[in-house]
Amino acid sequence: LQIREPFFPILEVVEFAFPKLWPEFCLTVGEMAEMGDNHGLTFIDRSEIRLRVDVYHGVEKKKGRDRLTLAHEVGHFLLHNNPGYARAARNSADIPAYRSSEWQANAFAGALLMPIEFLRTATSLREVAEICGVTSDAAETQTRGLARAGLLNNSALTEIGISRKRKGDHGGSPS
């Protein structure tokens, strides 16, 4: 693919590259009445990612939240290829956050759409959101998580305007 810019073409990769890599893969679009509150679903057993119709159209229009939803589902598809594990881990409150399939899919989506190399040189959260095609909340959450993990140096934190630890910040998901 040789993608060399911070804006990751998530829809193009899923629609055109995934079927070449996994011939059984399909991206489907579900109606709002069918999917309800589910913006996206991944069916590992049948190699399918399903997006709610409004989310699919949002990804087409490069809306940040919808791009993150698709990247999140891609995370499930690539990371959680054991259907039993994916379901069990999603529903377990007794495991550390990082072992949760939902946390992992969020972390994957953040890393995919906001490359750390770009975050290290970005001058503002607004720049991250605009260039990476994500929401400003996602840009802040990803940056804060990487800073907390010690993966962004202090000069980058100063440039982006995120302190290493905010008052009342006790950790959590990186995205």
Question: Which ranges hold each PLM region?
Answer:
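Active-site hotspot residues in diverse enzymes, especially metal/ion-binding acidic/histidine motifs
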Residues: 1-175
